């Protein structure tokens, strides 16, 4: 058998070679930049939370207990009521005790006014110098309130004459003060303290304090 002549064989078709396609490269994501307005808003919110927390801590620290006031002694001298003009002249002497029940908080009295009255009609008053109370401190305030020719209502004049004839008059003591509280580095804002002491029974026949019944005042801050 004669082998085939390669020259007479048909030429083979060559397949075109495909060029490898280049794969697209992943582009790095650009760095995200926060919006400046958003940064400011976040900062303000955080600042507000910190301030609120500080206020809460300060309030819990400086939340004051009720101050305790009592009238320890009271007397009157030169008590007189005019028969024709219903005017009063008198010198009222009071010993008032202020007690700060706080363990770690001091009290600063920026101003204080003490007045005495009969049936809500003031007849004398006096301003007390500023002072400071340390924790667990008791302060005695001795003061004299002078009534000099003070006009009374007809009802009060008649009632005081009747009480005087019995030897004891019923008076009221009012205390108004501007105070602030301090502990460590925190100081509270100024507040108005009010105390009402009633009834204060005063012996008009003697200036002695024997037999006086101590009066516990009602305080409000």
Curated annotation (Swiss-Prot):
Segments of skewed composition (Polar residues): 12-25
Regions that span the bilayer: 37-57
Q: Which Pfam families match?
A: LEA_2
Q: Which UniProt keywords apply?
A: Membrane, Transmembrane, Transmembrane helix
Provide the protein's localization: Membrane
Which residue spans adopt a coiled-coil conformation according to this UniProt entry?
none
Q: Which GO terms describe its biological process?
A: defense response to other organism
According to the UniProt record, one GO cellular component term is:
membrane
Region: Disordered, residue numbers? 1-30
Q: How does it sit in the membrane?
A: Single-pass membrane protein
Name of this protein:
Uncharacterized protein At1g08160
Protein's organism: Arabidopsis thaliana (Mouse-ear cress)
